[in-house]
Each structure stands twice: as structure tokens, then as C-alpha cells.
């Protein structure tokens, strides 16, 4: 029932010294390791083929070790040899291919079954476009699988601190070290290789990450499709080779959410057995009446349960109720007038903000300042300088911001190794429509010019303190992100959001992150990778609520159009450097200063992660930020007392 397929590889690794495989003095050692492996493991049925080693070149020593395997056992033998092991392998194999090259080898490689022995290099913020790889693999006739490099970050605690019992910094970061904390030899990376020991989809302490969420989703062997919102039915395809999906050891569960809040949940007590390699359509007993006032979503899960009738027992490795496969679909009718969205699994639509009318309050304008009182009698004030930059925003006498909105394109991750965009977090501003009353409201427009992008912000101020920012970006070069940055005041630590989550996700790594309503803190939104880099993005933003418990003030933000967000207490300019300079530093999370203010990004688009920290694709074209055209979103801000209902203005 555990179902592991194992490639068993001999401990033969030359790496930088690949000429050893052509040196006859090494034949005995290489052959001995290979022979002992086969003799040790050949009675394990989970071993489906052998591998002669890794990155040792294509020398003739492998003729000997290949024949040793074949003389001892009949299973296939694999060897990649950094691209030069074709003559000693029953499989076609390579490392870190691009998605397009995988697509070109869907019938096999070198006339043999194709095995991708390393791909999706998972160093840092990574595992982009995994879905696109598997679209090719699952649509092939000759590809047998692929291995992510690799499972776990292999950092250790700083030995100097560990001896005195220090594992974590004052800010809660682990004192993990990487190769950069050790000296290289003769200026070459022998023995340490910088951050290359940290390629895992989980952290050194085995913490789940957004990378693992994506892998779990893309790799799941049960697929949900063809959901009918009217019939409440879904097709379930069993991609397992041998195992049936039966109500004897699984249950199908569903949860219905209205604007991210749970309104119904249930399970199918029984369903028809789905044989391996087949599919069936099931109907869910959903009772929720769907209207056009909200976004309705349904999450469907295949969960493990205690077996009956002699079925395989999956609870030997996971708790009862654990989901081995899931999907999310929209129940809403598409209606752009009220912000509902309709899409298929992984491609939900973007929200649309309805027009807004203030329910009470009063508003005054003087020079570049908006003041007023909301419908709860709380005073507010918003101040701009002569260029149109927001310099102050208060509510009930409490500061809401530390710095107003400005263009921000800072973004750097390990996979940006071959990508060196311009960075900017400030712009030249000018007022194009002076602040003035417009009926009961007030309006103001500002133009901004930053490196690689111009933009406009059209402000609408409502008497109850609600503020709309309609932002239009016009990029002129390929940037890492297109969006606004701003700083909220100290104390806005508690977070509720309606977006993809709960873990970080990106445009090309969001298949395994579903829309939902989640609660957390700004500190807990850090992705603690060993090497500091951009983190915490949440795609398909609908709503964000920040609460300052000390001042009893809450800021609600709703998005209209394409938008994502991230929050942080750390200054990204400390690690976002041009070129490959971030690859040559000892910087750790615990070296960074935690600031009291909250750095916020509201992006129209952030570049996908890709796979370029080691081979692969830098970023697929559909996930790259546009370099021309105009792109718009609207952010609707509503300050209120924290004891008020947690609903942003509709």
C-alpha cells in the first residue's frame, strides 16, 4: 500500500572529477560498490531499476559496472553521466531539461524510455511551472517519470552557537548555515558550493512549504475534472496503475464556501468503485443555494479512512481523514457586475469590485488634505504632498501608514540567477487632477514615472472613509514585478486574507494553493529559506484585513481585477541585488533587521519562479511580466474600529 517505486543508485559520484570514469585504476572500486548494491537489494520488489552513479562522465569503466548489474539481475540499468552515459543505460536520461525539450521527447529519448533523473531544482523560492512539466509527462507515451532535486534543505545549525544551546535568533529564525559559511579551496567551490546544499522542498527541520503543496497537488494520482455547477457532479479519474478507489478505504468529502467562509460540508457515504486506470462521475449532495451576491467555491477531497472488506490500509502511513487528492471549483454564475467569478480548477477568475455608495459620513477637502467623519463618528485624515505622494493617513487619531503607495519592482529569488531586471521603489510623481469634491465624494489623480514603468493612480474618497485606488500600469521593460509598495504603521500584525493560501504561492506555483480565507500574522508569513529572498506572495487576492490590536483599528482592503499581495517586516533592498551577487554572500535571515512597520506589496503581476537556479526554464513566457501595454487593478481601503464587523465595504 505504500507504493514506492525505487531507482537504486550506486554510491559512485565524481562530480567535478568526471575523468575518473576513464581511469582504469578506479574500475575495482566502482565495480565493487555497484556489485554490493545489487547483491544487497535485488530481493526488494520496490527496486524497479538500478543506476550506475551520478555525474561521473561517460568513461569506459561503466562498461564493466553495467555488465556487472546485468550479470547479477535482469532489471533495467540507468545511467545519465551528465549527458554522456547513453552507452551504459537501458533508459534515455538527462538532467534539468526545459519544458519544451521534454515535450519534444514525449515518445522517448535516444530510442529508449525517457527518465528525467533530475529536474525542478528546488533551491530557495522555487518549483515554478511544475504543472507544465507534468502536462507533457502525463501526455506522453515514452516518459516514465522525473525526480525533483531534492527532498530536504541540508543546512545544519551553526556549530559555534549550537554548543551554547542557541538554535534560534531573537526574531525566531533558525541559526542555519550554508556553504557560504565555510571557506572554499583555492577559490573554487570544491567542498562547499555555497547555497547548493539547500535544494529541498521542505526545510532542514522538515517544515511543510509552498513548494511541497505544489508537488503534492501536481503529483496526485486521482484527478478531478468536468465539474458541473448545476448538476453538482464531478468526474474522478483514477490514475493509479493497480489500486482501485473504493468506499472501503476512502471517502469523498466536500466543503462549500461563500466568499471564503465555510457554509456547508459533507461526505459521500458511498460511491461506486473506480478501478485503476478508469474514471467515474459522482454527484455531491450540495444543498447551498447559490446567488449572485458572492463567490461560491467548492473544495473536493479524497480522504483516507479505516479500511473495510480487506481493502488496503492507508492509515499505516497517514492519519484517518488525510486528503490524498483534492480540487477546487466554482459554484458561482459568472456575473461581472457583482464580482463573482467562474473558472476551473487552478484558473479561478479575477474579482470585480461593484460600484460603491457611502452609507453616511461626511467629507471635506482643503488643499491636498481630505478629512471627515465616518458613519461611526470616527475622524479620519489623508494628506498628500505637492507631488501627489500620500504622506499621512490617520483614523480615530491613529496612524495607518508609515509610507504611502509608490511603484515597487524589487524581487529576487534563487531562480532569478539568469535574470537581471531594473529595480525601483520610488518614482517621480505629479498631480494630474487636483484634489477636489465630486458630488458627495472627492477625487484626485496622480501620474508616476519609475524605472521601467509609468503609472496613474485615480483616487476616489468616500464620506465614510473608504478610499478607492484605481491603478493603471504601463511598463516599458521586462520587470520582476509590476505593482505598488507601501508601508503600514507599526502594530498592524494580525492578518486575515481571502486569496490563495495558506502558504505562499506564485503565478506559476499556485496549482496546489486554493482560494480560501486564512488568518495569520505578518511575522508568520515569512518563508524561512536559508538564503533571504522574496517571499510570501498570495495570488488571486480578493480581500485583506489588517488589525492593530493595540490601537483597536482595522484596515480592510478589497481587490478588483488581477492582484496579489505580500506582507513583511523586512527591507527587501537588503537582498534584492542586480546580477548574481545574491549568490555570493553569507546573508542569513537572522542577519536582517526586523522593522516595526509592515512592508506591503500589491502587485498586478509578479514574475513566475521558473527553474533557473540550475538548468531548466528561467520563466515560461506566459508567466513573465509584460513589457508594453496598460494593466489596471483597483484597491478599496476601509479603515474601521477593530470591534466592527470584519467586512470590507461592499
What name fits each language-model region?
Residues 1-235, 239-247, 253-264:
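Extended substrate-binding grooves/exosites of carbohydrate-active enzymes
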Residues 5, 85-87, 109, 194, ...:
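A generic structural signal for short, non-catalytic loop/turn and secondary-structure boundary residues
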Residues 11, 52-55, 82, 97, ...:
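An acidic- and aromatic-residue-enriched active-site/binding cleft used to recognize and process polar
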Residues 25-35, 52, 58-70, 79-87, ...:
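Solvent-exposed, well-ordered amphipathic alpha-helical segments
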Residues 136-390, 469, 645-646:
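Carbohydrate-binding surfaces of carbohydrate-active enzymes
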Residues 285-293, 308, 333-650:
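Beta-strand/loop-rich accessory regions of lumenal/periplasmic or secreted enzymes
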Amino acid at each position: 500500500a505504500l507504493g514506492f517505486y525505487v531507482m537504486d543508485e550506486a554510491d559512485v559520484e565524481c562530480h567535478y572529477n568526471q575523468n575518473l570514469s576513464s581511469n582504469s585504476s578506479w574500475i575495482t572500486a566502482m565495480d565493487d560498490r555497484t556489485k554490493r548494491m545489487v547483491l544487497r537489494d535485488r530481493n526488494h520488489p520496490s527496486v524497479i531499476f538500478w543506476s550506475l552513479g551520478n555525474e561521473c562522465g561517460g568513461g569506459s569503466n561503466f562498461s564493466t559496472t553495467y555488465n556487472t548489474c546485468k550479470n547479477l539481475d535482469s532489471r533495467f540499468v540507468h545511467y545519465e553521466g551528465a549527458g554522456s552515459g547513453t552507452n551504459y543505460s537501458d533508459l534515455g536520461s538527462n538532467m534539468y531539461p526545459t519544458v519544451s525539450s521534454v515535450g519534444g521527447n514525449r515518445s522517448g529519448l535516444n530510442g529508449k524510455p525517457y527518465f528525467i533523473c533530475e529536474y525542478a531544482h528546488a533551491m530557495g523560492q522555487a518549483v515554478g511551472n511544475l504543472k507544465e512539466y507534468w502536462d507533457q509527462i502525463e501526455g506522453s507515451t515514452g516518459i516514465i517519470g522525473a525526480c525533483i532535486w531534492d527532498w530536504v534543505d541540508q543546512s545544519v545549525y551553526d556549530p559555534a552557537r549550537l554548543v551554547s544551546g542557541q538554535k534560534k535568533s531573537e526574531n525566531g529564525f533558525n541559526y542555519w548555515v550554508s556553504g557560504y559559511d565555510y571557506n572554499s579551496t583555492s577559490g573554487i567551490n570544491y567542498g562547499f558550493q555555497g547555497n547548493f546544499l539547500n535544494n529541498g522542498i521542505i526545510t532542514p527541520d522538515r517544515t511543510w512549504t509552498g513548494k511541497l503543496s505544489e508537488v503534492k497537488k501536481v503529483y496526485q494520482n486521482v484527478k478531478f475534472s468536468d465539474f458541473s455547477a448545476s448538476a453538482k457532479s464531478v468526474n474522478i479519474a483514477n490514475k493509479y496503475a493497480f489500486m482501485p478507489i473504493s468506499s472501503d478505504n476512502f471517502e469523498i468529502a466536500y466543503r462549500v464556501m461563500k466568499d471564503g467562509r465555510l457554509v456547508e460540508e459533507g461526505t459521500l457515504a458511498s460511491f461506486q468503485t473506480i478501478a485503476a486506470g478508469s474514471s467515474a462521475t459522482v454527484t455531491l449532495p450540495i444543498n447551498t443555494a447559490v446567488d449572485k451576491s458572492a463567490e461560491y467555491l467548492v473544495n473536493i477531497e479524497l480522504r483516507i479512512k479505516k479500511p473495510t472488506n480487506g481493502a488496503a490500509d492507508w492509515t499505516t502511513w497517514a492519519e484517518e481523514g488525510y486528503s490524498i487528492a483534492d480540487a477546487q471549483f466554482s459554484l458561482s454564475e459568472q456575473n461581472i457586475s457583482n464580482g463573482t467569478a467562474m473558472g476551473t480548477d487552478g484558473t479561478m477568475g479575477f474579482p470585480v469590485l461593484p460600484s460603491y455608495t457611502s452609507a453616511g459620513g461626511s467629507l471635506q477637502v482643503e488643499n491636498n488634505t481630505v478629512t471627515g467623519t465616518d458613519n461611526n463618528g470616527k475622524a479620519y485624515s489623508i494628506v498628500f504632498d505637492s507631488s501627489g505622494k500620500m504622506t499621512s493617513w490617520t483614523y480615530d487619531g491613529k496612524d495607518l501608514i508609515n509610507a504611502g503607495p509608490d511603484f515597487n519592482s524589487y524581487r529576487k529569488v534563487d531562480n532569478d540567477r539568469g535574470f537581471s531586471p531594473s529595480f525601483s521603489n520610488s518614482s517621480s510623481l505629479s498631480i494630474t487632477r487636483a484634489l477636489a469634491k465630486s458630488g458627495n465624494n472627492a477625487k484626485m489623480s496622480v501620474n508616476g514615472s519609475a524605472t521601467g514603468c509609468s503609472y496613474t493612480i485615480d483616487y476616489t474618497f468616500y464620506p465614510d472613509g473608504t478610499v478607492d485606488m484605481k491603478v493603471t500600469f504601463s511598463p516599458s521593460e521586462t520587470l520582476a514585478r509590476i505593482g505598488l509598495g507601501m508601508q503600514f504603521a507599526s502594530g498592524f500584525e494580525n492578518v486575515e486574507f481571502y486569496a490563495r493560501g495558506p502558504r505562499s504561492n506564485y503565478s506559476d506555483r499556485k496549482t496546489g494553493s486554493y482560494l480560501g480565507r486564512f488568518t495569520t500574522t505578518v511575522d508568520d508569513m515569512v518563508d524561512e529559506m536559508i538564503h533571504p529572498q522574496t517571499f510570501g506572495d498570495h495570488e488571486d487576492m480578493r480581500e485583506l484585513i489588517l488589525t492593530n490590536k493595540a490601537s483597536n483599528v482595522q484596515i480592510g482592503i478589497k481587490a478588483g481585477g488581477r492582484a496579489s499581495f505580500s506582507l513583511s517586516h523586512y527591507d527587501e533592498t537588503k537582498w534584492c541585488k542586480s546580477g548574481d551577487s545574491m549568490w555570493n554572500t553569507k546573508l542569513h535571515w537572522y542577519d536582517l533587521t526586523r522593522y516595526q512597520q509592515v512592508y506591503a506589496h500589491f502587485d498586478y503581476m509578479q514574475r513566475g519562479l521558473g527553474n533557473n537556479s540550475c538548468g531548466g526554464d528561467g520563466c515560461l513566457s506566459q508567466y513573465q511580466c509584460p513589457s508594453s501595454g496598460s494593466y489596471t487593478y483597483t484597491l478599496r481601503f476601509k479603515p474601521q474600529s477593530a470591534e466592527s464587523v470584519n467586512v470590507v465595504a461592499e
